[in-house]
């Protein structure tokens, strides 16, 4: 059925030619649900013991049916979730630049992104290996540099004057509780998306008559096809090469009397870890890391406000896309490349300074 572009629409009506990349959001929700299910199975048998928490995962592989599958899914899907999440964010940024997207949908999505970062970091710490122990020690000491509340937050996280069993127990409770709060925020994100409608290609902007279809089973099947195709590709990683996402140092048993040679974060934390590593001052590194996260939201807010006044300006659309993909994205990827290869570590200060100047200029 055809509707005029300014006509009031009844129910949830979508464009008949949505791109495949729109299905990434559905895949994210699908894999988040699988992560929560596998996480609940792991949480039932978790030992909040400072010494035995790493051996628990080995025991889970040996003594429980399909234990290796549950553990591999929970580990490998974390990297997959972040890969899909970054694709979803960059797709949303492109659509916000090109089309009018409501700010509330983006704001709730930004809160989801922050929650996922917190949940993933707590999950990284819970096995309590040499790497995660010293990673938590360094990060909590950085939090202690925050004025007024820093010392109190550090002691609250530790539960004592040092990291012990109570720390793992507290982090385990947070790691179980926060995903359910994440589900509530995710439902709000979907509600706002359905209420304000999605930015669907060129129909809302350039076409006077655009074909609108009811959100029927066809859209579900197409999204499910993408999700199950990704799941099929992940079967190889889960059953054969699941240690591909692991560092060798992640298997080293924790020893509080020995300092780890290096701290290697997961690849999806690499750009955040770069700020803490490149800035000598702890508080300034933490401050710039927070500014980086909020600069993404401020950049989109800037684009939306400009869009209100430059709605019909093709020059502004071209300028925004070139600005984002050639400068913002190049700085983001440069941080990854420089921090991933130690041979280029001497360049990290210059790349970090250039990226911060660009972000401040865009905002």
Swiss-Prot record:
Cofactor: record remark: Binds 2 heme b groups non-covalently.
Subcellular location(s) per record: Mitochondrion inner membrane
Additional remarks: Heme 1 (or BL or b562) is low-potential and absorbs at about 562 nm, and heme 2 (or BH or b566) is high-potential and absorbs at about 566 nm.
Protein residues bound to a ubiquinone: 194
GO MF annotations, alphabetized: metal ion binding; ubiquinol-cytochrome-c reductase activity
Family: Belongs to the cytochrome b family.
Pfam families hit by this protein: Cytochrom_B_C, Cytochrome_B
Role according to the record: Component of the ubiquinol-cytochrome c reductase complex (complex III or cytochrome b-c1 complex) that is part of the mitochondrial respiratory chain. The b-c1 complex mediates electron transfer from ubiquinol to cytochrome c. Contributes to the generation of a proton gradient across the mitochondrial membrane that is then used for ATP synthesis.
Main location: mitochondrion
Gene: MT-CYB
Record's protein name: Cytochrome b
Keywords: Electron transport, Heme, Iron, Membrane, Metal-binding, Mitochondrion, Mitochondrion inner membrane, Respiratory chain, Transmembrane, Transmembrane helix, Transport, Ubiquinone
Cofactor(s) the record lists: heme b
Binding site for heme b b562: 74, 175
């Amino acid at each position: 059925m055809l509707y005029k572009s300014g006509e009031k629409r009844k129910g949830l009506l979508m464009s008949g030619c949505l791109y495949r990349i729109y299905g990434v959001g559905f895949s994210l929700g699908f894999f988040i649900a699988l992560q929560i299910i596998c996480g609940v199975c792991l949480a039932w048998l978790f030992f909040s013991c400072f010494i035995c928490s790493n051996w628990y995962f080995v025991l889970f592989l040996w003594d429980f049916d399909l234990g290796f599958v549950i553990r591999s899914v929970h580990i490998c899907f974390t990297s997959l979730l972040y890969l899909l999440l970054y694709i979803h964010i960059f797709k949303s940024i492109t659509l916000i630049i090109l089309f009018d997207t409501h700010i509330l949908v983006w704001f709730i999505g930004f809160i989801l992104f922050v929650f996922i970062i917190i949940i993933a970091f707590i999950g990284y710490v819970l096995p309590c290996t040499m790497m995660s122990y010293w990673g938590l020690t360094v990060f909590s000491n950085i939090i202690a540099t925050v004025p007024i509340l820093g010392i109190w937050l550090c002691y609250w996280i530790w539960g004592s004057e040092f990291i012990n069993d109570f720390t793992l127990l507290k982090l385990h409770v947070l790691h179980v509780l926060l995903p359910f709060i994440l589900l509530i925020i995710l439902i709000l994100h979907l509600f706002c998306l359905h209420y304000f409608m999605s930015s669907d290609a060129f129909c809302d902007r350039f076409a006077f008559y655009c074909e609108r279809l009811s959100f029927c089973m066809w859209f579900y099947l197409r999204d499910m096809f993408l999700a199950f195709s990704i799941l099929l590709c992940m079967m190889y990683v889960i059953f054969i090469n699941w240690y591909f996402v692991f560092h060798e140092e992640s298997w080293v048993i924790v020893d509080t009397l020995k300092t780890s040679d290096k701290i290697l974060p997961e690849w999806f934390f690499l750009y955040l870890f770069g700020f803490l590593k490149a800035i000598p001052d702890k508080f300034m590194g933490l401050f710039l890391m927070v500014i980086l996260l909020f600069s993404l939201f401020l950049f989109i807010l800037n684009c939306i406000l400009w869009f209100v006044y430059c709605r019909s300006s093709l020059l502004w659309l071209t300028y925004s896309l070139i600005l984002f993909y050639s400068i913002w994205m190049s700085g983001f990827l440069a941080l990854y490349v420089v921090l991933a290869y130690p041979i280029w570590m001497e360049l990290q200060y210059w790349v970090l300074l250039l990226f911060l100047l660009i972000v401040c200029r865009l905002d």
